[in-house]
């Protein structure tokens, strides 16, 4: 349920860019009746499947242009359990949102019916983060450059985290 997924975090974000990667698609609005803050939605796309790197880099450019400090990336099938997104944002603020850190959630792996890491009420350092649910300080893109579009889909998230780690980003 795309509307339900979006509503799990939309009340706490300033803007949500919805990228349509459908060949022949574009910037048409999706049928999202029931979205809590439709005024926060912006539809983007280019009418062809360009992979997630191009979409992510479009979001980076948008964040820079509009003065945002952080970028949250999500897949269409991602959602937060009730209360989890505000807790995630509070954990980022408590840890230090101004730090050179890429923040990531602890993923629940549906096929294994278990979280990726042991559940704990703390921030742990990990070697890489999946794209969905990750929060990037926008300033890191000045330092590290943008996502590697030529990877298309697979490995974009890991490559960026590894590049960041080589530069001392946690």
Language-model segments: which ranges?
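Short, well-formed alpha-helical segments that are part of the catalytic scaffolds
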Residues: 1-12
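A conserved acidic beta->alpha catalytic loop
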Residues: 20-31, 48, 78-79
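Glycine-rich, basic loop-to-helix element that forms the pyrophosphate-binding segment
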Residues: 46-63
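Short beta-strand-to-loop acidic/aromatic patch adjacent to the donor-nucleotide binding site
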Residues: 68-77
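Conserved donor NDP-sugar-binding/catalytic core segment of glycosyltransferases
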Residues: 81-116
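A short, conserved alpha-helix in the catalytic core of glycosyltransferases
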Residues: 140, 144, 150-170
């Amino acid at each position: 349920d795309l509307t339900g997924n979006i509503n799990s975090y939309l009340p706490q974000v300033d803007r949500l860019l919805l990228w349509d990667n459908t060949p022949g698609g574009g910037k048409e609005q999706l049928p999202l009746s029931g979205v809590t803050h439709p005024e926060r939605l912006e539809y983007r796309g280019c009418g062809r499947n360009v992979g997630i790197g191009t979409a992510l880099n479009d979001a980076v450019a948008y964040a820079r242009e509009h003065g945002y400090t952080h970028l949250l990336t999500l897949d269409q099938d991602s959602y937060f359990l009730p209360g989890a997104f505000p807790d995630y944002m509070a954990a980022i603020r408590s840890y230090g949102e101004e730090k050179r850190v890429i923040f990531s959630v602890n993923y629940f792996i549906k096929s294994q019916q278990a979280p990726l890491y042991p559940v704990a009420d703390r921030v742990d350092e990990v070697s890489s983060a999946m794209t969905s649910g990750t929060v990037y300080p926008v300033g890191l893109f000045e330092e590290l450059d943008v996502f590697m579009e030529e990877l298309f889909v697979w490995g974009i998230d890991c490559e960026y985290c590894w590049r960041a780690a080589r530069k001392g980003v946690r």
